């Protein structure tokens, strides 16, 4: 299972990638 902190980090990276893609 993935630790919560690592899961949150992956989520943040995905959000940043989407934000960069939309800009």
Swiss-Prot record:
Could you state a single Gene Ontology molecular function term? Answer: hydrolase activity
Q: Where is this protein found?
A: Cytoplasm
Task: Give the enzyme's EC designation.
Answer: 3.1.3.-
Q: What is its main location?
A: cytoplasm
Tell me how activity varies with pH. Optimum pH is 7-8.
Does the entry annotate any disulfide bonds, and if so which pairs?
none
Asked if Cytoplasm is a keyword of the record, the answer is: yes
What organism is this sequence from?
Arthrobacter sp. (strain KM)
UniProt keyword terms in alphabetical order: Cytoplasm, Hydrolase
Q: What is this protein called?
A: NADP phosphatase 2
Subunit and partners: Homodimer.
Give the EC class as a word.
hydrolase
């Amino acid at each position: 299972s993935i630790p919560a902190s690592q899961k949150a980090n992956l989520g943040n990276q995905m959000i940043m990638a989407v934000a960069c893609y939309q800009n």
